Amino acid sequence: MEFGDLRIDESLIKTCQEKGITRPTEVQRQVIPAVLGGGDVIAVSQTGSGKTLAFVLPIVSHLLQKNRSFYCLVVAPTRELSSQIAECFNMFQATGLRVCLLVGGANFNVQANQLSKRPHVVVGTPGRIAEHVLKTKSFRTERVRKFVLDEADRFFEQDFVEDLETIIPSLREKRQTLLFTATMSDEISKLSSSILKRPKTIRTAEKYETVPALKEYYLFVAMKWKNSALVELLEMSQGMSVIVFVSMCVTARVMSLALARLGFCSEALHGELSQEKREEAMRSFKESRFNVLVCTDLGSRGLDISHVDLVINFDVPKSGKDYIHRVGRTARAGRSGTAITLVTQYDVEQIQKIEFTLEKKLEEFKMMKKNFGTICARIEEAIQEAQETLKEERKRNRRP
């Protein structure tokens, strides 16, 4: 099946082709006709399946037929994901499409001014959207005809329910609501029954499933050699685009600096960065200005980067669900990819829980460890230097 078979406007198909998107993914083949049909939709799909374009294309197609301001409102759980969705809509700005991004960390008054210019599409996080609903008169949510909740399962993890209770009543009763989620839960079922009317349910993934194109491994390594194993993996992956997941912001900062000292082109992405610096890090990684991104779970959703070759879980994820969202940064939209999880003697029970959730065993990654001793001295020295650098930074920042 081609995009033309889905009744998508030819100009939009041409734009997709220019971006290297030539054939619809499974979720796009199923969701696009349902959205064009006008009814409410629940889509349960794997991360990396191309779901963003699955709602962007039919919504822009409708806008080409009838130009309306405040036609679509998209709510996403993180600033990063909101930015990615806005970027996806902006692929089609040659059509005259106006998109407004509402996220925290950006100037509220500037956003209010953008809303006064009557955008066609508004994308943002629940907290900032709710704030504009209450304070910005030019935000005409009663005009919204397409309401999208993306990665809806995340709203309950981050307690956005109160914000949704502000946003949803402000919308018109007669609208199309689209709900996308990686997993189905009791909370999602309850939410969908309260805001959707006779929805069409589309499942392109069962609960806790990774994509077939993803090769998944674990690397068992003693705790004392964990840093060495990371360096060895990165040296084996020269020229590849790599995301390294860690559990804490301080680890992301230290490891990123340490790896840079060892000659790797690395940057960090974590929750202590300003919104401007987060966006710059993501943009630079996307543009291949560096190839190793060290990040916390902040980046495990919302990073829609097509060229990620390898995900390394330096720290084992807390749950099977977190594992899926991390490794879902590679092998996206039909491309292949690899995920390797470092497992120390202290992580065995946790990785077994993840395997139980996934209902499969990860394959062991075989690696020669004879160089670990030499590597260890280099990485430990680099880590010590990185820690000293951060210590000096903190001192400078504390000075009046």
UniProtKB/Swiss-Prot annotation:
Domain Helicase C-terminal intervals: 229-373
Domain Helicase ATP-binding: 32-202
GO terms assigned for molecular function: ATP binding; ATP hydrolysis activity; RNA binding; RNA helicase activity
Binding residue positions for ATP: 45-52
Listed GO CC annotations: cytosol; nucleus
Reactions mediated catalytically: ATP + H2O = ADP + phosphate + H(+)
Location of the protein in the cell: Nucleus
Self-association state and partner proteins as the record states: Interacts with the SSU processome.
Protein name: ATP-dependent rRNA helicase RRP3
Domains as described in the record: The Q motif is unique to and characteristic of the DEAD box family of RNA helicases and controls ATP binding and hydrolysis.
Function recorded in the entry: ATP-dependent rRNA helicase required for pre-ribosomal RNA processing. Involved in the maturation of the 35S-pre-rRNA and to its cleavage to mature 18S rRNA.
Database matches in InterPro entries: DEAD/DEAH_box_helicase_dom, DEAD_box_RNA_helicase, Helicase_ATP-bd, Helicase_C-like, P-loop_NTPase, RNA-helicase_DEAD-box_CS, RNA_helicase_DEAD_Q_motif
PROSITE patterns on file: DEAD_ATP_HELICASE (PS00039), HELICASE_ATP_BIND_1 (PS51192), HELICASE_CTER (PS51194), Q_MOTIF (PS51195)
Residue window of motif Q motif: 1-29
Entry's EC annotation: 3.6.4.13
Keywords: ATP-binding, Helicase, Hydrolase, Nucleotide-binding, Nucleus, Ribosome biogenesis, RNA-binding, rRNA processing
SMART domains tied to this protein: DEXDc, HELICc
One of the protein's GO biological processes: rRNA processing
